[in-house]
Amino acid sequence: MSATTTPLPKAVIFDAYGTLFDVHSVVAAAEQMFPGHGDALSQLWRQKQIEYTQLRTLADPAGARYQPFWNITLDALRYAARKLGLDLDMPGEKRLMDEYACLSAYPDTVPVLRRLREMRPGGERIGLAILSNGNPQMLDIAVKSAGMTGLFDRVLSVDAVRAYKPAPAAYALGPLAFGATARDIVFVSSNGWDAAGAGWFGYTTFWINRAGAPAEELGVIPHGTGGGMADLLDFIENLAPPDKSPGRSRHSPGG
């Protein structure tokens, strides 16, 4: 884990897809449907999904080109299947979209979220939220199916501003929800571009580099990095004053 000096967080906000939820947990179903192509379909599906969100916001920041994330996810799936020459019929679409609606959580996610809920640095609980490109209905289903009900104070969707990350209007939802400055909130994402966008906006950022990818060449460095949620917990504990919550010892930054 790496870290730089940051203030005590008033809240921790998580990206959802790829950070809490494993977007590639659809591979098994995709591979069963298209043997030998499941991984390629999942990878291209995700790539086009992100591209389409960004293109729609870039084309018209006012939101005229906005489509809900569910629609974009379906469009991206259809493109990926055509690109790979796969015969994806309507029942197949439904099966894969149903899989996407109920993505698996990464194994390290729920235990660390519960630990964060228990923390009382300085006697106050740290607020927890999701800030996601997902539309509200998608997020509600995903949170429930992943066993995360009750772990978040807020589940924030960019649908409220009709602009996808990394648009500033999307990131502004976090400080507004908690009545805090962006600097006083830790924004957590596994997507390097998302961590960079949040950093530009002013958040304290933590990049969960699950894939072991190189840092983005964007001139902005996350305040902390790590390979999983346990590293995030260490990062938060080193920002916070000692509390009386049970469970973990403290470590020095960079340990």
Which ranges hold each PLM region?
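An amphipathic alpha-helix signature
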Residues: V27, S42, R46, W70, ...
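Substrate-recognition element of Asp-dependent hydrolases with the DxDx(T/V) motif
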Residues: M90-C102, T109-A146, L156-V158
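Short helix-capping segments at alpha-helix termini
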Residues: F34-G38, K83-L88, P121-G123, G147-L151, ...
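A metal-dependent, Asp-based hydrolase signature
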Residues: D39, Y52-R95
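Active-site neighborhood of HAD-like aspartate-dependent phosphohydrolases
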Residues: S2-I50
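Hydrophobic side chains within well-formed alpha-helices
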Residues: V26, L41, G92, M148-L151
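Asp-based, Mg2+/Mn2+-dependent phosphohydrolase catalytic module
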Residues: S2-P9, L131-G255
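Intrinsically disordered, low-complexity coil segments
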Residues: T57-R65, R117-G127, D243-K244
